[in-house]
């Protein structure tokens, strides 16, 4: 089970988990009180593919039907769970009485249903604040992909957004400055 920790110099209130089906993943929300304003923060770690090293070492000429079928089942099951999780996260965003900042590992690329569902009606801080920089956040494999996001309500303004190239994990952290 994953847990989130939010560190803030501002008071955090109304902390709760967003309910959805998952074996190990979680989304949580809390309200951040900044002077007389309140912003809803939604932190996410959506379903991963749970691929093992051997799953990624496929020689297409010699892959057995069983192995290919097993891999397809893993990909499909994780994708289905993420779609349902995205619906729950979007419902939480829509129900918020405050502007929202939604962050985290969506385990989905920008062209995916999951990203599109959660982003609908929101601003992608990377697209608006990165000034054309590369945005890969997941560093395994030969090509980096962007699966970690900072999104905000349209009433908020992304000012800057950067991917920090530090090696703390298999993901690079994403940092944004958001105005209101």
Task: Please report, for each region that a protein language model flagged, where it lies by residue.
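A solvent-exposed, charged loop/short amphipathic helix patch at secondary-structure junctions
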Residues: 56-75
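Hydrophobic positions in the central parallel beta-sheet of the AAA+
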Residues: 42, 101-102
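Structured beta-strand-rich core segments of catalytic domains in phosphoester-bond hydrolases
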Residues: 1-54, 162-165
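Soluble or luminal CAZymes and related metallo-dependent hydrolases
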Residues: 20-22, 74-88
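N-terminal post-signal-peptidase region of extra-cytosolic proteins
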Residues: 15-18, 23-28, 87, 131-140
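Active-site metal-binding loops of divalent metal-dependent hydrolases
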Residues: 46, 105-106
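Metal-dependent phosphoester-hydrolase catalytic domains
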Residues: 84, 91-100, 106-180
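Short aromatic-enriched loop/helix-cap "lid" or pocket-rim segments at secondary-structure transitions
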Residues: 52-56, 113-115
């Amino acid at each position: 089970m994953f847990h989130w920790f939010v560190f803030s110099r501002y008071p955090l209130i109304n902390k709760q988990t967003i309910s959805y089906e998952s074996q190990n993943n979680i989304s949580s929300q809390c309200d951040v009180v900044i002077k007389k304003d309140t912003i809803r923060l939604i932190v996410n770690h959506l379903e991963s593919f749970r691929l093992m090293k051997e799953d990624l070492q496929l020689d297409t000429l010699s892959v057995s039907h069983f192995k290919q079928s097993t891999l397809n089942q893993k990909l499909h099951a994780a994708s289905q769970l993420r779609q349902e999780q995205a619906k729950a996260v979007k419902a939480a965003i829509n129900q918020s009485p405050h502007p929202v900042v939604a962050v985290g590992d969506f385990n989905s690329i920008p062209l995916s249903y999951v990203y599109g569902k959660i982003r609908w009606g929101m601003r992608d801080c990377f697209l608006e604040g990165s000034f054309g920089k590369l945005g890969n956040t997941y560093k395994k494999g030969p090509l980096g992909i962007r699966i970690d996001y900072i999104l905000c309500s349209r009433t908020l303004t992304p000012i800057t957004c950067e991917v920090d190239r530090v090696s703390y994990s298999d993901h690079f952290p994403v940092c944004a400055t958001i105005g209101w």
